[in-house]
Swiss-Prot record:
GO terms for biological process: cell division; G2/M transition of mitotic cell cycle; mitotic cell cycle; positive regulation of D-glucose import; positive regulation of gluconeogenesis. Phosphorylation at Ser-62 by MASTL/GWL during mitosis is essential for interaction with PPP2R2D (PR55-delta) and subsequent inactivation of PP2A. Phosphorylated by PKA. The keyword Cytoplasm applies. Protein phosphatase inhibitor that specifically inhibits protein phosphatase 2A (PP2A) during mitosis. Inhibition of PP2A is enhanced when ARPP19 is phosphorylated. When phosphorylated at Ser-62 during mitosis, specifically interacts with PPP2R2D (PR55-delta) and inhibits its activity, leading to inactivation of PP2A, an essential condition to keep cyclin-B1-CDK1 activity high during M phase. May indirectly enhance GAP-43 expression. Belongs to the endosulfine family. This is cAMP-regulated phosphoprotein 19. It comes from Homo sapiens. The keyword Phosphoprotein applies. Residues 1-11 have a biased composition (Low complexity). Interacts (when phosphorylated at Ser-62) with PPP2R2D. Interacts with SNCA. Interacts with PPP2R2A; the interaction is direct and this interaction inhibits PP2A activity.
Length: 112
């Protein structure tokens, strides 16, 4: 029993020390609550904001709306089969494979 008494005393001393440390913070908090009583009452903001959050906003801005609208159009329209079956990347083009450039109608000012 004598071993428990010093531990209890040390626990009480620690509690007193914590109270001394936190008491200035609690005093400052009490001052602020007295000065601004309406701040801590309503978590979640104004009634307008709460109503908007409950309603659930579907689109952030007009860009989101237009993208969703375009997705809906893409789902409704039947996709046309591609008439070109050309596969790209079969070979590396060489200068002989490329078509010739057409001469420009306007004379270049750099060639002058």
């Amino acid at each position: 029993m004598s071993a428990e008494v010093p531990e209890a005393a040390s626990a009480e001393e620690q509690k007193e020390m914590e109270d001394k440390v936190t008491s200035p913070e609690k005093a400052e908090e009490a001052k602020l609550k007295a000065r601004y009583p309406h701040l801590g009452q309503k978590p979640g903001g104004s009634d307008f904001l709460r109503k908007r959050l409950q309603k659930g906003q579907k689109y952030f801005d007009s860009g989101d709306y237009n993208m969703a609208k375009a997705k809906m159009k893409n789902k409704q329209l039947p996709t046309a089969a591609p008439d070109k079956t050309e596969v790209t990347g079969d070979h590396i083009p060489t200068p002989q494979d490329l078509p010739q450039r057409k001469p420009s109608l306007v004379a270049s000012k750099l060639a002058g």
